[in-house]
Curated annotation (Swiss-Prot):
This is Lon protease. Residues 7-213 form the Lon N-terminal domain. The lineage of its organism: Bacteria, Bacillati, Mycoplasmatota, Mycoplasmoidales, Mycoplasmoidaceae. Pfam families: AAA, Lon_C, Lon_lid, LON_substr_bdg. ATP-dependent serine protease that mediates the selective degradation of mutant and abnormal proteins as well as certain short-lived regulatory proteins. Required for cellular homeostasis and for survival from DNA damage and developmental changes induced by stress. Degrades polypeptides processively to yield small peptide fragments that are 5 to 10 amino acids long. Binds to DNA in a double-stranded, site-specific manner. It is found in: Cytoplasm. The keyword Transferase does not apply. The gene is lon.
Amino acid sequence: MPAVKKPQILVVRNQVIFPYNGFELDVGRERSKKLIKALKNLKTKRLVLVTQKNSDQLNPEFDDIYHCGTLCDIDEIIEVPSEDGKTADYKIKGKGLQRVAITSFSDADLTKYDHHFLNSTLTENKALDKLLERIFPDKEDFAEILDSLNSFLELQELKKLSKVPKDIKRYDIITFKLASLIFKDITLQQAILEENDIEKRLQKIIGSGIEDLGHISEEARAKQRESEFDKIDNRITRKVNEQLSRQQRDFYLREKLRVIREEIGMTSKKEDEVSNIRKKLEENPYPEHIKKRILSELDHFENSSSSSQESTLTKTYIDTLMNLPWWQESKDNADVKNLIKILNKNHSGLDKVKERVVEYLAVQLRTKKLKGPIMCLVGPPGVGKSSLAKSIAEALNKCFVKVSLGGVHDESEIRGHRKTYLGSMPGRILKGMVRAKVINPLFLLDEIDKMTSSNQGYPSGALLEVLDPELNNKFSDNYVEEDYDLSKVMFVATANYIEDIPEALLDRMEVIELTSYTEQEKLQITKSHLVKRCLDDAEIKTDDLKFTDEGISYIIKFYTREAGVRQLERLIQQIVRKYIVNLQKTGEQQVVVDVDLVKKYLKKEIFDYTVRDEDALPGIVNGMAYTPTGGDLLPIEVTHVAGKGDLILTGNLKQTMRESASVALGYVKANAQSFNINPNLFKKVDINIHVPGGGIPKDGPSAGAALVTAIISSLTGKKVDPKIAMTGEITLRGKVMTIGGVKEKTISAYRGGVRTIFMPEKNERYLDEVPKDIVKDLEIILVKEYKDIYNKIFN
């Protein structure tokens, strides 16, 4: 069998460990910490604890320690941060087992020592019982002796010893317990530990002064204690009365308790907290009015009961004032070149947006003033509004704080609750400032268009004070009740729909619109950012899993339908997960993600995009739709049958598009002869206008020109080339009005096979947003009136 190692020796200071006694020790010396660190890995954790004679000795040798210690079981080892913060200290908990005599000791190796165990000796139980009677008169059995110990020393844990048998161990337990509780002097404690004879040990305890208790009756002893307590109480009362005149009873009791603590040299947790707060106020440049307010609240806190609700509320309020940044300021990076570099690194595409952001910030960086309007980024979900704000904060070296305003309907969420209310707290603005810890962060107000109003106030009204540069230097929060300067905060707001932003707020903001990403932009974002991030998260090398451009484009076209790239990223993650599973099964490490693998991993396509018809038919014309996720072709079908001149609209058309259809028909009727249509025909036929995709609601006026063309084509039987598409609102006088979403509509039409596009002349200024490689392959015809379209198509 392998030899069992001796327990190592741990030298302790200012404490003697007795058998049968539990203990806690803080371990901070380097040699001791190495010992405890090694002990953590052992199954049986035992140490021999010996006390050093001089507590100031850092590295005690054999002559510097007492040669009698205690073998102990170590039950718990707790790692705690050290004062230097570099290495960990330890706290150990355990229980003494048996006394040990050390006869030699090696400072180099704590396991090299000679020892033998010490056993207590018992001469006669009766003599010991008599000695115990001197301490505990009139007690018939051991349980009553322990009850007396409890009564005298107020230690309930001794009750569990009442079942210990009447033998040597019984007297060991009593004497060592008494010695640990009564003696504070290390020398006296060590003398008790080294004494083998239980009778002599007990006599030493009696000789310390506790024997006086054995010569007086229970009644006399009670009177003596009462007399001593009276003297102390009278002295305390006298002191309290000097300080009090006419105060309430609870204040009297608290003051009395404070004096008692002074008498016994004990400070409370509250006193420590108050002392720390006063120290911080002295050391830091808090504004004078804030110092005055904190000191006033501190007086209330000191004079309130620690268990009272008032004390908790006051302390929370003080902490809020202390934690708000009043003077702390980070140093901004005013380098515009660095701003451009960071924006280009973190965001593909968005060239117009980045240009506007740089222009907006360049002036503020030059003047070092934030007096201009607040930047508001508006766009569909997932196009990078929040990440753009983060990049701005990174480039300017500003702390980034985000507060989501979606669903906020209570003004108190912005301005805070009055601190007299139960559960009151500051508003989201000042909570964000507490998190920022500086007075000049970049503060993102996310989803500002999602706030609602209720009978609890108007949150948008509270935000006016926050966002107005002329007012926010004295922002008032109901909870703090002190003016707070927000003038150095750079606020950036985000929204999905500009029409949902309250007009008063919109007036204070510089709106920068982020449109949906094109397929080419999504491809670049995926290659530059998404794939790398997904592979890094899964700890996969880029050489092991390669994504082809064709594979990524296939995912974009047939598995996503979104303005941003969130769903696209989720699909990339799904492919990565399937790759890892396949790697575990087959061991195939290097894989190329092409179209075939995308189909295998993601199964059948989820979406499709509209493609033009191959054959031309009367009454069918390609419109162009602008959707929240981009754009698409909008085929319009018109047919006429014998009837009474009714207009039938199908395809889930909303109000605006229904009106546009009525206007289109009215224009055709008014100009029927110009279009070679018999005016009497309208009384004899019903015209049915249908837009395929009945499950999708369709709205907007931009299909007017296409509706007119489809009606003329149906009534005249003339076909329209399917390679043609058009967009533009029509008026009753035939003018083609400007529309929105030029970039998205043009890209989707090109994707669908269209090569000629009619659009309003006033939309020419938006064509520079369309990728040049698409524009060069298209014939874009700009028109003012519908007759320009008619002449090109039908003549």
